[in-house]
A protein has these predicted regions:
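Active-site "lid/cap" and pocket-lining segments within catalytic core domains
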Residues: 1-155
Length: 155
């Protein structure tokens, strides 16, 4: 028997249920989805993360799970390096899509996302990152910044 096909909603800094493009995308698909949050052990050790920040995230996830329980859904809270966690999930499921918001943060989160993108490409997983805050990752200069800003503003 084959693995269960699933989509994954990867919650990063966008801890909410209202007006959430990743949840909306997962709901519009005809396969089950697994909402996850990863306390990435490679990221939380950096000095820009505090116990207060981690407590806020934990309590926000508890609140989301209270709301999702009426839909028989729950955010699975995971701890470890993100790539290792996605490899483990791939051993359990046939991952079709990963839906998340594009994160803008520290260099380490950018490097993590590059590793996850390579993993997705190697395993034929579609990773759809929704634009959240008008930041365009990976650009080398600000040429066409005004044009890009207007496009994002009116999407």
């Amino acid at each position: 028997m084959g693995k269960l096909a699933v989509n994954i909603v990867w919650i990063k800094r966008d801890i909410r249920t209202i007006d959430h493009d990743s949840f909306n995308a997962a709901e519009s698909e005809n396969i089950p989805y697994l909402p996850i949050y990863i306390f990435d052990s490679d990221l939380i050790k950096h000095r820009d993360t505090s116990d207060r920040h981690l407590g806020f995230i934990f309590n926000s996830l508890k609140d989301i799970n209270r709301k999702l329980s009426s839909y028989n859904k729950e955010v699975k809270v995971l701890y470890g390096p993100s790539l290792k966690i996605f490899k483990s999930l791939l051993n359990q499921y046939k991952i079709e899509n990963i839906f998340s918001y594009q994160e803008s943060g520290i260099k380490q989160s950018w490097q993590r996302d590059i590793r996850i993108k390579i993993f997705c490409d190697e395993n034929s997983i579609n990773w759809l990152e929704f634009q959240r805050d008008g930041i365009i990752r990976g650009i080398k200069n600000r040429r066409n910044w005004n044009k890009n800003f207007i496009i994002i503003l009116y999407l």
